């Protein structure tokens, strides 16, 4: 018996990286999973992986989280396919890279807020009627140590992720009487963003791993996923409004690397 048997989760950006790892950890504990992903091949692959690896019920729903109607359809897919929704994980992100603050454009900054803040806002609003039904409602939003520490040349990412963290805390305060727990994970793991950095600058990626107190970058399934599964289950029923740094201790000294920019 898994800790999430009978529960239903929606995970955005579940086709790869941290989102895929979280989807796997939830499925491993017995949850049915809606794999919300813009990349059809990646999303289909993740859903099949969940079925093959853990015998999970998994449904791929192609979702552009910057499109409100698609976000609403994603939430509806959970109840249409599985009859309920207990867990909402807002993870999707696709940024525009590094830039000095003075070179950041209005369009790129807005795009970051659409991807992180508006997407989660729409999903949380739409999901609330289901989340509050059974006392099992959980919202898990993925934010970043980079935002907390104001990492250089990452204004789009930092501002959007910190706004999402405040949105989460506000929801935690307002929805606590409804027994809907809302928490943040700030992961240090092999995300797609990390993979792109590693491909572009292997030396920087090696330095990032070396700077971590544990000497490595976390694994999405085995390091981040179990924390998400804990937050999704009954053991976290008295935990809300928190930010969990799941990063091998990286938050102790802060971000120790800086990207190269023009």
Please provide the spans of the model-predicted regions.
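Active-site-adjacent segment of SDR/Rossmann-fold oxidoreductases
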Residues: 29, 149, 158, 170-180, ...
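Short C-terminal tail/terminal secondary-structure segment
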Residues: 98, 240-262
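Amphipathic alpha-helical dimer-interface segment in Rossmann-like NAD(P)H-dependent oxidoreductases
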Residues: 115-133, 172-173, 177, 233
């Amino acid at each position: 018996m898994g800790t999430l048997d009978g529960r239903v989760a929606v995970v955005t950006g579940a086709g790869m990286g941290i989102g895929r790892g979280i989807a796997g950890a939830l499925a491993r504990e017995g949850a049915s999973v809606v794999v919300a992903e813009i990349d059809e091949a990646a999303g289909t692959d993740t859903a099949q992986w969940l079925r093959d690896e853990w015998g999970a019920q998994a449904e791929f729903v192609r979702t552009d989280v910057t499109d409100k109607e698609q976000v609403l359809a994603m939430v509806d897919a959970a109840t249409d396919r599985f009859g309920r929704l207990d867990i909402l994980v807002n993870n999707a992100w696709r940024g525009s890279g590094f830039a000095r603050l003075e070179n950041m454009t209005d369009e790129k900054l807005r795009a970051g807020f659409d991807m992180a803040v508006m997407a989660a806002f729409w999903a949380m609003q739409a999901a609330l009627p289901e989340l509050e039904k059974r006392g099992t409602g959980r919202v898990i939003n993925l934010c970043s140590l980079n935002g907390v520490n104001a990492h250089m040349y990452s204004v789009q990412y930092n501002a959007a992720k910190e706004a999402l963290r405040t949105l989460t805390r506000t929801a935690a305060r307002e929805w606590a009487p409804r027994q809907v727990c809302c928490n943040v994970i700030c992961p240090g793991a092999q995300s797609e963003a990390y993979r792109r950095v590693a491909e572009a600058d292997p030396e920087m990626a090696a330095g990032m791993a070396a700077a971590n107190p544990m000497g490595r970058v976390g694994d999405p399934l085995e390091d981040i996923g179990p924390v998400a599964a804990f937050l999704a289950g009954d053991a976290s029923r008295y935990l809300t409004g928190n930010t969990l740094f799941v990063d091998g201790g990286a938050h102790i000294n802060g971000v120790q690397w800086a990207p190269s920019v023009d």
